[in-house]
């Protein structure tokens, strides 16, 4: 019996696969400007995160010390709850008075002008002389 030899296309494919495994590694990539930009931005963000953790730690320690030093019989302000109503807006009459539209100088409605006396002159003389006819 004769040994089976691979057919020519299979032999070529085998040689191609074997030769590609001996390829030299790619040369090192040249540094780019974007690499430096990314690195500096990353280090800036890391520094910012470190500073934020430090501040949170300091504030947390300080608040823990404050709660430890408060005597039990002292009057301490309770922490506000999320479902509490803001007392500034509990006076609905004052809120409605503030939101009512007010008349501006030319008689149109305006939310921005405060209530009070209006000037006797609607327009100055300078305004009248510089006004262009429509």
UniProtKB/Swiss-Prot annotation:
Cited SMART domains: GLUCA (SM00070)
Tissue specificity field: In the brain, expressed in the central amygdala, hippocampus, area postrema, nucleus of the tractus solitary and cerebellum. Expressed at higher level in the cerebellum.
Location(s) in or outside the cell: Secreted
Signal peptide annotation: 1-21
Propeptide: 22-31, 63-134
Positions in coiled-coil regions: none
Domain of life, source organism: Eukaryota
GO aspect biological process, one term: adenylate cyclase-activating G protein-coupled receptor signaling pathway
Assigned keywords, A-Z: Amidation, Cleavage on pair of basic residues, Hormone, Phosphoprotein, Secreted, Signal
InterPro entries: Glucagon_GIP_secretin_VIP (IPR000532), Prosecretin (IPR015675)
Gene Ontology annotations for the cellular component aspect, listed alphabetically: extracellular space
The keyword Phosphoprotein appears for this protein: yes
PTM annotation (Phosphoserine): residues: 63
Modified residue annotations for Valine amide: 59
GO molecular function: digestive hormone activity; G protein-coupled receptor binding; hormone activity; signaling receptor binding
PROSITE patterns (UniProt xref): GLUCAGON
Alphabetized PANTHER family for the sequence: SECRETIN
Role description: Hormone involved in different processes, such as regulation of the pH of the duodenal content, food intake and water homeostasis. Exerts its biological effects by binding to secretin receptor (SCTR), a G-protein coupled receptor expressed in the basolateral domain of several cells. Acts as a key gastrointestinal hormone by regulating the pH of the duodenal content.
Family per record: Belongs to the glucagon family.
Name this polypeptide is given: Secretin
Organism: Rattus norvegicus (Rat)
Encoding gene, per UniProt annotation: Sct
């Amino acid at each position: 019996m004769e040994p089976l030899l691979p057919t020519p296309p299979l032999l070529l494919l085998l040689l191609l696969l074997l030769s590609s495994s001996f390829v030299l590694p790619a040369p090192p990539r040249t540094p780019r400007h974007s690499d430096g930009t990314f690195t500096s931005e990353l280090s800036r963000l890391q520094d910012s995160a470190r500073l934020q953790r430090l501040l949170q730690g300091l504030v947390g320690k300080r608040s823990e010390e404050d709660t430890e030093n408060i005597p039990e019989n002292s009057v301490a302000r309770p922490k506000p709850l999320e479902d509490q109503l803001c007392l500034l807006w509990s006076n609905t009459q004052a809120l409605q008075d503030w939101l009512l539209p007010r008349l501006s100088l030319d008689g149109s409605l305006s939310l921005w002008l405060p209530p009070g006396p209006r000037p006797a002159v609607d327009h100055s003389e300078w305004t009248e002389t510089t006004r262009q006819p429509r």
